Amino acid sequence: LVFGSLASGVVQLGDLSRLGPLAIRTFVLFFANMSIAVALGMVMMNAVRPGDTIESETKVRLVQEYGGAAAKHVERQSQHPDMNLQTIVDMFMPRNLVGSIAGTDRSMLGEVLPLILFAILLGAAAMSLEPTRRKSVQQGLETLTELMTGIVHFALRLAPYAVPAMIYSVVVKIGWDIFVALGVFVLGCLAVMILHLFVTMSIWLKLLSRHSPLAFWRKIRPVLITAFSTSSSNATLPTALAAAREDLGIRPTTAGFVLPLGTTMNMAGTALYEGCVVLFVAQVFGIDLSFGQQATLLLLAVFGAVAVAGVPGGSLPIIAGLLITFGIPAEGIGIILGVDRLLDMSRTVVNVGADLVTATVVDALEGDEIPS
């Protein structure tokens, strides 16, 4: 899913590069939006540290039980407390690319970092092909993404049966402290999402466009309600396009370029959530990530969010991969499954709202109509 979605998005740039300044402004704003969102989320998790509400004895027991990745990570950290350039290079470009992605054995799952790099490289290489062949590659990648999305949907249909069992297992192993930790985690996530959407994005509107923030949020309220109720950026796209053209007065060329691309490449709420979950689960297991690792996490959360399918629960496979990348037991994802649906609805609102803000800002910066 990560490979197909990200590589396909890169291949599309071959068709969009002719739009020049529009594309450059859009991608710069996408990256800035998601980076700010992740940074805010990580600051919040480091400030409130919801995972620290769990007793230290419980953390030790969890590390012992899930051992493997967590224990190896703690050992590595004692030997290499700070991440250096060589470590970062090895994370992105291992000696055995296929082995790193697939996992060395049944006890070691693959890592997401080399996969992201390979997807970007393959997509960039495909851009150099002649249009007909490039289109064939893009169609193949899109088909792969659709197939993987179908598999994820099948797994998500089983979730209502699996989640109660996983929550029961978590409570038995961790105790009732987990509910306090989850409560602090949820409130922290919601607070940061509100802060980013209605404060950061309002500042963007005020400084970079001609729109009044209050009038803007009032005009797109139906779009945000649709996003919250469907938990899907893709399902909200038709409503967002209509609001952009009819209510916000955004040029059709700008709206038609920014919003569809934003449903897969401007996932601020998703990126924010990914960073928060990784730090929270790391705290639950008693694992401290260094500043260098958290900086790497910020970038990975941004790139990982780009690869997330715009469907309910689409970020869960990415989060599992991020946990593995930082040596945190992937089983820890079970801790947040019970509250994921509420936060999924909320982060979709942030994703869609930020898409419309970006389209508004890009349209204001463009000034003149972009030729078709």
Give the role of each language-model region.
Residues 2, 159-162, 232-240, 254, ...:
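Transmembrane helix boundary and interhelical junction motifs in multipass membrane proteins
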Residues 9-18, 53-54, 130-135, 143, ...:
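Juxtamembrane helix-boundary/capping and inter-helix hinge elements in multi-pass membrane proteins
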Residues 25-35, 39, 43-55, 59, ...:
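Signature of multi-pass transmembrane helix bundles
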